Amino acid sequence: MIDKIKEGREEYKRIHMTSIIYQWSIEEWHELVDSGLLEGKPVELLEGNIVEMSPEGIEHSYTNQSVSDYLRDLFKGQAHVRDAHPITLDNSEPEPDIAIVQLPATIYRNHHPYAQNIYWLIEVSNRTLTKDLEQKIITYARNGIPEYWVIDLKNKKLIVHTQIQNNSYSKVIEYRSGTIASQAFTQIQIDLDKLLLY
């Protein structure tokens, strides 16, 4: 009997704890950020949940900066390249490692880039590969981000996601060498050696 009571209590906790998880709206999130309470805390908003971001390792930091600089030079006058800054989506405000967005950059003085401003996003992954390929990919596809690249540092490859169908990317291609073009700028060839840093 005691065991059944304990089981009942645990089941009650499970059901009720699940039901009271708070979902933050974008407006509430902005108020929280503006209040200063999150100052210095490595967190982002994903699907209404405040999620802790992984510390940035040396290889990740170097790759992120190198790739951003390369793309900034390559797309000068064509697109604005942002690194490690927020984007505003529906119920999410993640901080992708690199976002290639529309010009002019001055339009982001009053708001972060929206989905319609984004050409494509890049995540540099080492310890965050599971999160980038299982969690963030859902958010990006559901919000209509047309193209999502993941630089897999551990396996030295680029994983490109395109063609959204039913809130997911239906086309996934892996690259290890050569050149590639974003579907937004088919005339500009990107050297994979510059992304994977061979």
Annotate each language-model stretch with its function.
Residues 1-198:
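Gly/Pro/Ser/Thr-rich low-complexity, intrinsically disordered segments predominantly at protein N-termini
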